[in-house]
């Protein structure tokens, strides 16, 4: 697959030397495909790799001291469990949730790298999902399930496009890693991990998300509005077989990631 030219970066946040060296990738996949397990493996694999996790704790309003990405702002502390609210009353909370989810992803992709990463010779940032999957997978699916109405969907697309155009040079990605698993396997893993907010998720919803991931990242037939996204390199990893406790499978996945990085 042809690789597009390295993006132009004009961010005042980081020095030009770092921006020329760093590679930014998102880890995409269905709910419970294995992303959290995968990014933990990545984080341990190299001192030059940094993982920016999905801010689940923020969405659940859970205060934690384990990771600064999971801390809450003052305005959130009495905001309730937005993820639970989404699953309990999707038609009421879908637009609110997707608006906040996208905002939190923009913040994550603009976050200042760690000092260790700034000094790395070959720095890599991995983001657990991205502003693109927020729109083309999750918000789109909620609209198709009629949990987001036409007016909300039009507004979401309008500000999402404007937002990304404003920050394009700072949040653009070099590539995407798609963790591919069947909806049935994702359902099994969802039940195994036992996240309370997710217990009402139906297989039909996972099938819808799977179809969208396939269209976007596997078949590459999905229509997208951002030119950089149309030609972005994608590596597909089959994670239908469990790899959480299998060191051989983990090493095989890491080898593929290293090959992909070398091609960018």
UniProtKB/Swiss-Prot annotation:
One of its GO terms (molecular function) is deoxyadenosine kinase activity. Substrate binds at residues 54, 87, 98, 129, 134, 198. InterPro entries: DCK/DGK, Deoxyribonucleoside_kinase, DNK_dom, P-loop_NTPase. Phosphorylates the deoxyribonucleosides deoxyadenosine, deoxycytidine and deoxyguanosine with highest activity against deoxyguanosine followed by deadenosine and then deoxycytidine. Shows only very minor activity against deoxyuridine and deoxythymidine. Homodimer. GO terms for biological process: deoxyribonucleoside monophosphate biosynthetic process. The keyword Glycoprotein does not apply. It is found in: Nucleus. Its EC number is 2.7.1.74, 2.7.1.76, 2.7.1.113. It catalyses: 2'-deoxyguanosine + ATP = dGMP + ADP + H(+); 2'-deoxyadenosine + ATP = dAMP + ADP + H(+); 2'-deoxycytidine + a ribonucleoside 5'-triphosphate = dCMP + a ribonucleoside 5'-diphosphate + H(+). PANTHER family: DEOXYCYTIDINE KINASE 2, DEOXYNUCLEOSIDE KINASE. The active site is at residue 128. GO terms for cellular component: cytoplasm; mitochondrion; nucleus. Keywords: ATP-binding, Kinase, Nucleotide-binding, Nucleus, Transferase. It comes from Xenopus laevis. This is Deoxycytidine kinase 2. Belongs to the DCK/DGK family. The keyword Transport does not apply. It comes from the Eukaryota. The lineage of its organism: Eukaryota, Metazoa, Chordata, Craniata, Vertebrata. ATP binds at residues 29-37, 189-193, 241-243.
């Amino acid at each position: 697959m042809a690789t597009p030219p390295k993006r132009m970066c004009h961010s005042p946040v980081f020095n030009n030397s770092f921006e020329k060296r760093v590679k930014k990738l998102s880890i995409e996949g269905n709910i419970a495909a294995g992303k959290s397990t995968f990014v933990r493996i990545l984080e341990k694999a190299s001192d030059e790799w940094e993982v920016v996790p999905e801010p689940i704790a923020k969405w659940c309003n859970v205060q934690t001291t384990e990771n600064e990405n999971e801390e809450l702002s003052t305005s959130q502390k009495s905001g309730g469990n937005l993820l639970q609210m989404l699953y309990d009353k999707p038609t009421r909370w879908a637009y609110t949730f997707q608006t906040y989810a996208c905002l939190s992803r923009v913040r994550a992709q603009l976050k200042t790298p760690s000092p260790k990463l700034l000094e790395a010779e070959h720095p890599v940032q991995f983001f657990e999902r991205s502003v693109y999957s927020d729109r083309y997978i999750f918000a789109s699916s909620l609209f198709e399930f009629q949990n987001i109405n036409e007016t909300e969907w039009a507004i979401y697309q309008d500000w999402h496009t404007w937002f990304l155009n404003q920050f394009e040079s700072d949040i653009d990605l070099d590539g995407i890693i798609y963790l591919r698993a069947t909806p049935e396997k994702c359902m099994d893993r969802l039940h195994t991990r036992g996240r309370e907010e997710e217990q009402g998720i139906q297989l039909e919803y996972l099938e819808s998300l799977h179809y969208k991931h396939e269209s976007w990242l596997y078949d590459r037939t999905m229509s997208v509005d951002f030119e950089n996204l149309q030609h972005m390199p994608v590596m597909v990893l089959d994670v239908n077989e469990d790899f959480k406790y299998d060191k051989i499978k983990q090493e095989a996945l890491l080898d593929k990631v290293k090959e992909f990085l070398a091609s960018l």
